[in-house]
């Protein structure tokens, strides 16, 4: 038994200069796990609650001392003496202790930090890497793959202070034979994009996730400069590299319409889906995330009908890593992929359940960071340990993003051929 003897919570800083929760779980034998909760900017209304203090005199109300107190108080008391390898039991205890639908009593940030720290401590006690422990918890021991990175090299929306409405423009290095090669391809495209933007007299400052954030005349212009960068790097768009979008459409959904204020266009629900379809006909866009508002289920049905057989349609705000909402989507044939964010649901056990449900239904699962991150690289181990096949963890700068890429490099070095990089096959795995 990997007995828990100490649980510690503390307030640390995230990549946007806001506080977040870090937890340590100590076991008999000197084993320790430490993890931090991330934080989102564009958030779904049905996400588990991130508990903030609300004291405007301290961190502008964004302090997390209440959540930290919950770690050091009731959560600690409930978990002392428990077996850290019994992840489902630990998470169940914390969920029951909270007793609310969205974890608003203890805070999803408090529960998640402890949940992940316990998993890390358990892996240490078992003498195995975290990804191997996650694979065992997932019921898929020894089944690994290296994820295709969806690299957010141009930022807009809530992630940048510019006029681009679509939140993320991503490249996927699909012709690579390994993750290491994919990362190199992405880095070369990133550096070439900087040159392309500079040559056009455009801003090369970066957004929350490390992508460039220039002002552009239209969303199509963003795709055009990325195409130029891909070709300048010596790669062929559509063969070596494919494109992905995160529209985060809930952020510009107003009064039943989709308002692209950056380019002065307003669309109906079906009209915006038709607009996205036209972009996929001009560029090799193989994945679109949150192409409509989280509440626009009728519109999602239309978008799935016109794009679902050709494009990976990812539900982020739509599904919020929640099996209840995902099961409704599966039943109605809405989208064909789910974005997986630990802190949307608030525990490792519930996260694994969402990944399993998606895969069993023929949906793909894309593991994701948040725009507010720390140096914690747990999502890298999650992606490999569940063989999810795809990961979103930002651009090729900002150490909070690169930490995840570097952890994936280490894991690939350890696993070698046991963790294949499958490229476009992963994206085409949708049902």
UniProtKB/Swiss-Prot annotation:
Record InterPro entries: Enolase, Enolase-like_C_sf, Enolase-like_N, Enolase_C, Enolase_CS, Enolase_N
Recorded superkingdom: Bacteria
A GO cellular component entry from the record: phosphopyruvate hydratase complex
Active site: 209, 341
Localization, UniProt: Cytoplasm; Secreted; Cell surface
Catalytic activity: (2R)-2-phosphoglycerate = phosphoenolpyruvate + H2O
Gene Ontology biological-process entries: glycolytic process
Class of this enzyme: lyase
GO molecular function ontology, one term from the record: phosphopyruvate hydratase activity
CDD domains named in the record: enolase
SMART domains assigned to the protein according to its UniProt record, in alphabetical order: Enolase_C, Enolase_N
Binding site for (2R)-2-phosphoglycerate: 167, 341, 370-371, 392
EC code: 4.2.1.11
Pathway note: Carbohydrate degradation; glycolysis; pyruvate from D-glyceraldehyde 3-phosphate: step 4/5
Matching Pfam families: Enolase_C, Enolase_N
HAMAP family: Enolase
Stated family: Belongs to the enolase family.
Subunit structure, interactors included: Component of the RNA degradosome, a multiprotein complex involved in RNA processing and mRNA degradation.
Protein purpose: Catalyzes the reversible conversion of 2-phosphoglycerate (2-PG) into phosphoenolpyruvate (PEP). It is essential for the degradation of carbohydrates via glycolysis.
Protein name: Enolase
Species of provenance: Shewanella amazonensis (strain ATCC BAA-1098 / SB2B)
Source species taxonomy: Bacteria, Pseudomonadati, Pseudomonadota, Gammaproteobacteria, Alteromonadales
């Amino acid at each position: 038994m990997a007995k828990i003897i100490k649980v510690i919570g503390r307030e640390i800083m995230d990549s946007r200069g806001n506080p977040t929760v870090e937890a340590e779980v100590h076991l008999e034998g000197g084993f320790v796990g430490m993890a931090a909760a991330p934080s989102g900017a564009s958030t779904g209304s049905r996400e588990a609650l991130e508990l903030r203090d609300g004291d405007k005199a301290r961190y502008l109300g964004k302090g997390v001392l209440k959540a930290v107190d919950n770690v050091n108080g009731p959560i600690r008391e409930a978990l002392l003496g428990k077996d850290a390898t019994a992840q489902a039991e630990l998470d169940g205890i914390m969920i029951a202790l909270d007793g609310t639908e969205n974890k608003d009593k203890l805070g999803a940030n408090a529960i998640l930090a402890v949940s992940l720290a316990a998993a890390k401590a358990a892996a240490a006690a078992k003498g195995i890497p975290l990804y191997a422990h996650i694979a065992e918890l997932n019921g898929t021991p020894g089944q690994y793959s290296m994820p295709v990175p969806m690299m957010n090299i141009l930022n807009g929306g809530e992630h940048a202070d510019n006029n681009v409405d679509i939140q993320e423009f991503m490249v996927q290095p699909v012709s690579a034979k390994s993750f290491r090669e994919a990362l190199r391809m992405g880095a070369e495209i990133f550096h070439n994009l900087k040159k392309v933007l500079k040559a056009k007299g455009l801003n090369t400052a970066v957004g929350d996730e490390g992508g460039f954030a220039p002002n552009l005349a239209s969303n199509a212009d963003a795709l055009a400069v990325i195409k130029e960068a891909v070709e300048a790097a010596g790669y062929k768009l559509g063969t070596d590299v494919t494109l992905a979008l995160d529209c985060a459409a809930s952020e510009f959904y107003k009064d039943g319409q989709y308002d692209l204020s950056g380019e002065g266009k307003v669309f109906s629900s079906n009209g915006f889906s038709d607009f996205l379809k036209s972009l996929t006909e001009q560029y090799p866009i193989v994945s679109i995330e949150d192409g409509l508002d989280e509440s626009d289920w009728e519109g999602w049905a239309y978008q799935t009908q016109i794009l679902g057989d050709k494009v990976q349609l990812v539900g982020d705000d739509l599904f919020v890593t929640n099996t209840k909402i995902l099961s409704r989507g599966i039943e109605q044939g809405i989208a064909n992929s789910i974005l997986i964010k630990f802190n949307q649901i608030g525990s490792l056990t519930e996260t694994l359940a969402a990944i399993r449900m998606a895969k069993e239904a023929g949906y793909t699962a894309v593991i994701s960071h948040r725009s507010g991150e720390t140096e914690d690289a747990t999502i890298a181990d999650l992606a490999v340990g569940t063989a999810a096949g795809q990961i979103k963890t930002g651009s090729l700068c900002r150490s909070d993003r690169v930490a995840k890429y570097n952890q994936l490099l280490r894991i690939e070095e350890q696993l070698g051929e046991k963790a294949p990089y499958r490229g476009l096959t992963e994206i085409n795995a949708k049902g």
